[in-house]
């Protein structure tokens, strides 16, 4: 992929952002179907929208894959920098949420407790996406090699497996 922005990826990114926003609207959006009478058209429309917005995370991951997997011969240092940035964000924000838990009396301070919960992803549930993205970045060199050497038959086989087992 060249450095020029791909318009279709930007459109998909906008769609994914809108889906994430809808997913976080609570009773004013995502859970609106629960305020409708089951079996009515409005119930099914809002239910469909709520289910459809769950497509946002796989869409973001697909966009990341399209952008990052296609880059040939990218230096390992570049990927290490990406990983480092995500780890820093994860450590800093997790520490802030850990301090909040201490302030609220939910736990007492312990470096060991902080590190164990940071590694386990138990400090703040809404940071889960950073763990997912971090796993993607760590796997990126392997995934890139697989993607670059995948022929059409193996790609079709992989898609069939994904559809059947998901």
Tell where the protein language model's regions lie, with residue ranges.
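Aromatic-enriched alpha-helical transmembrane segments of multi-pass intramembrane proteins
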Residues: 119-121, 145-166
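Transmembrane helix-loop junctions in multipass membrane proteins, especially transporters and channels
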Residues: 32, 36, 75, 102-110, ...
């Amino acid at each position: 992929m060249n450095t020029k922005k791909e318009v279709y990826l930007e459109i998909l990114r906008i769609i994914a952002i809108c889906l994430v926003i809808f997913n976080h609207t609570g009773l004013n959006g995502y859970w609106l179907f629960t305020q409708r009478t089951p079996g009515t058209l409005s119930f099914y429309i809002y239910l469909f929208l709520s289910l459809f917005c769950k497509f946002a995370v796989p869409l973001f991951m697909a966009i990341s894959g399209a952008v990052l997997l296609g880059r040939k011969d990218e230096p390992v240092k570049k990927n290490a920098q990406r990983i480092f940035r995500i780890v820093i964000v994860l450590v800093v924000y997790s520490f802030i949420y850990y301090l909040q838990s201490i302030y609220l009396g939910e736990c007492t301070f312990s470096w060991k407790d902080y590190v164990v919960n940071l590694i386990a992803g138990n400090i703040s549930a809404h940071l889960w996406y950073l763990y997912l993205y971090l796993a993607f970045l760590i796997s990126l060199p392997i995934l890139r090699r697989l993607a670059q050497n995948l022929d059409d038959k193996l790609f079709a086989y992989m898609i069939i497996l994904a559809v059947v087992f998901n």
